[in-house]
Design a protein with these regions (language model features):
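Short, glycine/acidic-enriched loop or turn micro-motifs at the edges of active sites
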Residues: 79-81, 184, 219
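Acidic, divalent-metal-coordinating active-site segment for phosphoryl/phosphodiester hydrolysis
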Residues: 213-225
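Conserved non-catalytic scaffold segment of RNase H-like nuclease domains
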Residues: 59-61, 70-164, 169, 175-176, ...
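Short alpha-helix plus adjacent loop in nuclease-associated cores
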Residues: 179-196
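Short helix-coil junctions and helix-kink-helix linkers
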Residues: 22-36
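Short, cationic-aromatic polyanion-contact patches
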Residues: 51-66
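Acidic two-metal-ion nuclease catalytic site recognized across multiple nuclease folds
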Residues: 2-7, 12-19, 36-37, 46, ...
Length: 262
């Protein structure tokens, strides 16, 4: 998957508005989007939220959306292995806006076999999945739930990459949603010797079970909300937040005054 192509495309839009013709050309040049009919409705269906202004220029909605107005979809999956050798067996997600949960999603996924070590870790057995919906049906339902919200996860590259690759294999096309990693964000706002989900749950006294998709998504949502409450005053928009989560210390110092840790 050419995730680097997609990231470069979105990063250019994050810098400034682009002419419609540029947007169409760059969109169509992405390998996985070669056979997608280009129009802004399809762009939104794939998860990217954009505006078209009177000058026929495209901009990311994240640049003009206040953090309190943004919808964040915090996601966690359980799988039988890596994206190359395994499959998703559970998806859990919770949507939050302005510090409040507004919706949740949870589904097991049918699989013929669950490795013993995965069953021991998650408590999910082959018997539990025998009558679960098939992966394409779950992915289709999840994508409708996700919409064009910001995709958030603890170690977002794994969950986002696995779901996007699975969607593409099932013929639904890759994800274009902007994404936010709560590990990266936590490193910039929380003083902790470790940044695993378990370590941050203990530090922040988050009382949820571990290693089930919805429970872990709820934990990550709590971490997200804690981090948002600690943001420096100059982080106003969703794009500010996304940029901040990936920023270096030097870049943060250049933005404004130093960030106070918890």
């Amino acid at each position: 998957m050419s995730q680097q192509q997609i990231d470069a495309f979105i990063n250019e839009l994050a810098k400034q508005s682009k002419p419609y013709a540029w947007f169409e050309r760059e969109f169509s040049a992405i390998d996985e989007l070669e056979f997608v009919d280009f129009d802004l409705d399809n762009v939104k269906l794939l998860g990217l939220s954009v505006n078209l202004n009177a000058k026929n220029e495209i901009s990311l909605k994240s640049k003009s959306t206040k953090i309190k107005d943004e919808i964040f979809c915090v996601v966690d999956i359980e799988s039988t292995g890596s994206v190359r050798s395994g499959q998703i067996i559970e998806i859990g997600a919770v949507k939050v806006q302005n510090g409040k949960e507004i919706a949740r999603f949870e589904s097991l996924v049918r699989a013929s076999e669950v490795p013993e070590n995965i069953s021991e870790l998650t408590g999910i057995t082959s018997k539990m999945l025998a009558n679960a919906p098939h992966l394409p049906a779950v992915l289709n339902e999840f994508r409708l739930f996700l919409g064009d919200s910001i995709f958030v996860a603890h170690n977002v590259g794994f969950d986002y990459g696995f779901i996007s690759a699975s969607l593409d294999k099932c013929g639904f096309g890759v994800l274009l949603n902007q994404r936010l990693c709560t590990i990266n964000l936590s490193r910039r706002l929380i003083a902790s010797p470790k940044y695993s989900l378990a370590a941050l749950k203990e530090l922040l006294d988050i009382q949820t079970p571990h290693h089930r998709a919805l429970a872990d998504a709820l934990s990550a949502a709590n971490i997200l909300q804690h981090c948002i409450s600690k943001l420096p005053f100059y982080i106003k928009s969703t794009q500010d937040l996304l940029n901040f989560s990936k920023s270096t210390l030097k870049e943060r110092k250049a933005m404004s005054e130093p960030v106070l840790l918890r």
